[in-house]
């Protein structure tokens, strides 16, 4: 008999159910977590033995959404799920980041977490459910894991924090923040915000951490009922004698090497010291493990840098704790792009471009929660040459997708609304040099490139990466961290925003004991750094350019009667196709009658507008128009009177005397004055040449609304 063990509890406005013991019993642990009809099945498998020579912790997190969860069949050619989407990759990273630091140092057994979304309520995002599931499964598994963790989404609506807001509530929220942590400490924050203050952001982190304690308590209760015995794993005993010997050979030399401010020169010197030290030790005892020696040397490096920072000495590159590296800001660096910028901060550099397109260029995302259209695209590329290495170049890796998403979050809050600026915008950041915080350099470069492209962003934004070194009660917060300070520190803390507030905040904390006060110091120090960078950026460009690039499509907007949309589109799209070919423009029509005409040439746009106005103009009964004969039949002739509208001149209305043969009076293509006698309920038009000739002057084309240019 299958006997499920179930825990059910209230979490904010939702009911959460944890269930184990009924499915995937050959996995190390498996949990089905549901939150109001959104259900995620999470499994964990851990290998009891580490692979020989394994020198890093091989943790893999896979997050996969099944379309059956939403009652749909995949739209792909093969009608089955393919490789992970960008959204799935981002959620896999979201699960990975808070659990990774909770495995003990020295644990290198392979662990795989697989989270599968099996049911989805469109109002409840599965990411928090998956994070809770991963925490529960790891806690049940017996694998050495210092959890459990809780996870919460925090919104900010009407000046109130909201726990786990629904998708509808998120649309009204000024904040979308995910926080994860243990009972004692926050471990990870990922957020985007509409320029909130430092205090509001910190309040959200603290609120989310307090609220998620109920999750941790319930996972602990589930473990008491259904947990597997804890693995009898012990770290390798520390070889104190070997540590001392390595330190005697290398510590002083590494300390000197870390006074070299140039990254490449420093790395070269550190490599020499390491290889010479390892060679000396292997000559003394060839049974020594080279990997173990490498780990000891890395620990010495870490200690050298950390102790120097804590003692108040200058950092690796000679800076004080709150100093920003030298900045170089240039805009308009590429002649044919719509907007471009080169942003350099020390040895980190980003070449960023902005490209404007029409609504047709927007990305349609067929997601589990429903289809949505994205009109702001942000792509981040990290080629191997940026760190002086060779390597594969191809589709973006998980890290590039994650960094691109963070940079996008940093800029999103200042992007103009589509009704004010009806363009799809794509920003691409090419990292040309990297030594710390290339994602935040991408935010700065994006802000500059967008202004260079004439995109009316609400404010300039900049980003900065902060670090932390902490031993006991002694701690130092570092501004604008280098790559080495990121690896060797206890916290990586990225903040983007304008002068008025924060647009994105990302935190990854590797230790417990980071208090609210420490986070407050880091946020305030980050604000000072952000304002300094914005000041330098404003010297290069302090407002969006007054006009878009001559190479960008100009979008002109006119309004037509929604009833006339069918006339502009035509049967099977024939009219709109002919219009785009005739005028050389791109034409998009919305359901409310908004027509957007995109063209790089103003004259072409005017021509397209004129043609659309002709097609949509109302035909006035009693008015005389100049028309062209398009068809001749026995009972009369059809005459086009502009805008693709055609009316019938009956044989009795051709002349004021009896007409025996229509062709005696009219020829194909002949221009004739016609008077509109009637437009019937079906839109058919009756015309008269006889009555028109009695009136002296034909009327001009009907008036239509003037175009507005969407700049």
From Swiss-Prot:
Residues 694-711 have a biased composition (Low complexity). It is found in: Cytoplasm. The keyword Cell cycle does not apply. It holds the Pfam family RNase_PH_C. HAMAP family: PNPase. Belongs to the polyribonucleotide nucleotidyltransferase family. This is Polyribonucleotide nucleotidyltransferase. It comes from Escherichia coli (strain ATCC 8739 / DSM 1576 / NBRC 3972 / NCIMB 8545 / WDCM 00012 / Crooks). The gene is pnp.
């Amino acid at each position: 008999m299958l006997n499920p063990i179930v825990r059910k509890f209230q979490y904010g406005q939702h009911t959460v159910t944890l269930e184990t013991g009924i499915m995937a019993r050959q996995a190390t642990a498996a949990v089905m977590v549901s939150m109001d009809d959104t259900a995620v099945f999470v499994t964990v498998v851990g290998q009891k033995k580490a692979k020989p020579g394994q020198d890093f912790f091989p943790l893999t997190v896979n997050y996969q959404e099944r379309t059956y969860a939403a009652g749909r069949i995949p739209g792909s050619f093969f009608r089955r799920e393919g490789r992970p989407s960008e959204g799935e990759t981002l959620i896999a990273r979201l699960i990975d980041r808070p659990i990774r630091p909770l495995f003990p140092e020295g644990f290198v057994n392979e662990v795989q977490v697989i989270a599968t979304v099996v049911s989805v309520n469109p109002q409840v995002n599965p990411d928090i459910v998956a994070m809770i599931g991963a925490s529960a499964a790891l806690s049940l598994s017996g694998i050495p894991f210092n959890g459990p963790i809780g996870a919460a989404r925090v919104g900010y609506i009407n000046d109130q924090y909201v726990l786990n807001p629904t998708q509808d509530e998120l649309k009204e929220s000024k904040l979308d923040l995910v926080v994860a942590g243990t009972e004692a400490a926050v471990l990870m924050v990922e957020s985007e915000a509409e320029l909130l203050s430092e205090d509001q952001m910190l309040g959200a982190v603290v609120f989310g951490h307090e609220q998620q304690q109920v999750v941790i308590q319930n996972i602990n209760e589930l473990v008491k009922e259904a947990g597997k015995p804890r693995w009898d794993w012990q770290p390798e005993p520390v070889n104190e004698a070997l540590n001392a010997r390595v330190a005697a050979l290398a510590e002083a030399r590494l300390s000197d090497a870390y006074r070299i401010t140039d990254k490449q020169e420093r790395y070269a010197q550190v490599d020499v010291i390491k290889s010479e030290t390892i060679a000396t030790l292997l000559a003394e005892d060839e049974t020594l493990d080279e990997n173990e020696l490498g780990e000891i040397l890395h620990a010495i490096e870490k200690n050298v840098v950390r102790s120097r920072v804590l003692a108040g000495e200058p950092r690796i590159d000679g800076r004080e704790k709150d100093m920003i590296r030298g900045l170089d800001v240039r805009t308009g660096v590429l002649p044919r792009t719509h907007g471009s910028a080169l942003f350099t901060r020390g040895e980190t550099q980003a070449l960023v471009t902005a490209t404007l397109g029409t609504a047709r260029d927007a990305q349609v995302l067929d997601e589990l929660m429903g289809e949505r259209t994205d009109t702001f695209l942000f792509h981040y590329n990290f080629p191997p040459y940026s760190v002086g290495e060779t390597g594969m170049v191809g589709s973006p890796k998980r890290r590039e997708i994650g960094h691109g998403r963070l940079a996008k979050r940093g800029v999103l809050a200042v992007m103009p609304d589509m009704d004010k600026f009806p363009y799809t915008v794509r920003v691409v950041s090419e990292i040309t040099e990297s030594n710390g915080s290339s994602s935040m350099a991408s935010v700065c470069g994006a802000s500059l490139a967008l202004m260079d492209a004439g995109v009316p962003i609400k404010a300039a934004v900049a980003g900065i990466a902060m670090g932390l070194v902490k031993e006991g009660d002694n701690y130092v917060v570092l501004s604008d961290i280098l790559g080495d300070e990121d690896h060797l520190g206890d916290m990586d803390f990225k903040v983007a925003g304008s002068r008025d507030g924060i647009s994105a905040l990302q935190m990854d904390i590797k230790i417990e004991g980071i208090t609210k006060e420490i986070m407050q110091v880091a946020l305030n120090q980050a604000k000072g750094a952000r304002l300094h960078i914005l000041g330098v950026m404003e010297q290069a460009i302090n407002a969006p350019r007054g006009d878009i690039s001559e190479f960008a499509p100009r979008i002109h907007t006119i309004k037509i009667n929604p009833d006339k949309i069918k006339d502009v589109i035509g049967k099977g799209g024939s009219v709109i196709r002919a219009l785009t070919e005739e005028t050389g423009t791109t034409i998009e029509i919305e359901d409310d009658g908004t027509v957007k005409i995109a063209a790089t040439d103003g004259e072409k746009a005017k021509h397209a507008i004129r043609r659309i106005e002709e097609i949509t103009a109302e035909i006035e009964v009693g008015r005389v128009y100049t028309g062209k004969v398009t068809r001749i039949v026995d009972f009369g002739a059809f005459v086009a009177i502009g805008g693709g509208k055609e009316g019938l001149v009956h044989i009795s209305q051709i002349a004021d005397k009896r007409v025996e043969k229509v062709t005696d009076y009219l020829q194909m293509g002949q221009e004739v004055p016609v008077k509109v006698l009637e437009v019937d309920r079906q839109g058919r038009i009756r015309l008269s040449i006889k009555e028109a000739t009695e009136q002296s002057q034909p009327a001009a084309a009907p008036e239509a609304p003037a175009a507005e240019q969407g700049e």
